[in-house]
Amino acid sequence: MNFKLLRENLDFLREFDEANLKALKAKLNAYESLFHSFGKVHNISHFKALEKELIDSLKILDFKDLSGFKNGVDIGSGAGFPALFLALILKTNFTLFEPNSKKAAFLMLIKSELGLENVSVVKEKIERFKLKFKAQLITSRALMSAPKLVGLCDGFFDDNTLFLLYKGSKVYDELKGFAKYEITEFDKRKYVLIKAKNLSKSHLNKNA
């Protein structure tokens, strides 16, 4: 893991003392080792440059203070980007929804090996999960439209919830039906922030 590259691109790391930086580096190195060893047996991701994925997952923290959220939900967590690493930095209690068996097994392995007590893994699609709860923060880097993502989360948010969606070049087309939102850009990434209190019933369309 090229930790120097992370420090050069993630400004918030400047606020970490040496002890916390050392602890973070150890966990990221452990993740990298497990990612490659697990990946040799199970094809869970095509990522080759993990540093790029980490920067993409965490760069939003250079622009927005997300430290006040007590709990969060992530949709389609895959190999853990972004929520696993947001949980590592923010200490927010995150529930990761990942229906793919191999990917869910990897996330559970990471949770165990890294001692991430603030991370829970659910091997199920969020819309099929019956024990609904209100999340203060909902994140996703999944490749589905913003309206569909919001619709799938019906029952998991209230007026105090903030959606953080990691989107690409087509984001403005996806957001045509949304009256209020905020976009922060870095490189080719568009970080979309939507306050649930600004949503209407028309946004709860799982088939959008």
Which residues are covered by each model-predicted region?
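Conserved SAM-binding loop of SAM-dependent methyltransferases across substrates and taxa
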Residues: 79-91
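Short coil/turn segments at beta-strand junctions that form active-site/ligand-binding loops
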Residues: 68-70, 92, 133-134
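Class I SAM-dependent methyltransferase "Motif I" SAM/SAH-binding loop
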Residues: 73-79
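S-adenosylmethionine
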Residues: 85, 95, 99-208
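Class I SAM-dependent transferase core
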Residues: 2-73, 102-105, 109-119
